[in-house]
């Protein structure tokens, strides 16, 4: 007769859960603080609003587990602004993306990086911040999956980070674009694209975050 512990482990495996160690992991929210103010943004606004609920839940679970959250954000051409002004701009009711930005707005405990281009790594302090935090695994989420999320994933892969990209926490202009981006991340970049509800944060006994030399 199988022991009860073995049965429980088998049940969890059959449920398709993905264990994610707390130590060495960071949650990255890419361009979720976003005014979404461009021609033809209506469909993306709708998709982003649907994405906000599972992403907010994932962030809550990550924070409770002790996983740091880093906002990677465009400055929308406001070169004299800081992140606080960017948030204020995006949560204003005049912004098409204000519902998403309000639901996913950062807290005082979160980190943020402003990016000048598509990738969160290009000409930013992200790599240095991740190294300082001892991060070797990144959970990539946000807007748009086929552009900024994918560009960031490419750069993360080239820097030997393990990639998670929960499919329900990433949106693009079209479903086809999003599916293509997720396939690229899953197949080419060897990332895990399971839905966020399958990610299970756990603390390994005696584990320590590994820093690169």
Residue ranges: model-predicted function:
Residues 35-37, 77-84, 102-112:
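Short, basic/glycine-rich phosphate-binding loops at helix/coil junctions
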């Amino acid at each position: 007769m199988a022991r009860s512990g073995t049965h429980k482990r088998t049940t969890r495996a059959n449920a398709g859960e993905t264990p994610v160690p707390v130590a060495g992991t960071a949650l990255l929210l890419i361009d979720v603080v976003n005014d979404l103010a461009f021609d033809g943004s209506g469909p993306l606004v709708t998709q982003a609003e649907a994405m906000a609920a599972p992403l907010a839940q994932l962030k809550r679970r990550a924070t409770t587990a002790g996983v740091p959250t880093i906002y990677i954000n465009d400055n929308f051409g406001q070169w004299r602004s800081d992140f606080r002004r960017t948030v204020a701009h995006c949560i204003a009711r005049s912004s098409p993306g204000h519902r998403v930005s309000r639901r996913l707005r950062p807290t005082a405990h979160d980190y943020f990086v402003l990016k000048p281009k598509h990738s969160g790594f290009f000409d930013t302090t992200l790599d240095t911040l991740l190294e300082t935090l001892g991060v070797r695994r990144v959970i990539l989420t946000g807007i748009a999956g086929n552009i900024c999320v994918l560009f960031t994933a490419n750069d993360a892969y080239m820097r030997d980070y393990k990639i998670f990209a929960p499919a329900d926490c990433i949106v693009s202009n079209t479903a086809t674009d999003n599916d293509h981006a997720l396939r690229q991340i899953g197949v080419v970049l060897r990332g895990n694209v399971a839905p966020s509800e399958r990610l299970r944060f756990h603390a390994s006994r005696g584990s320590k975050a590994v820093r690169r030399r």
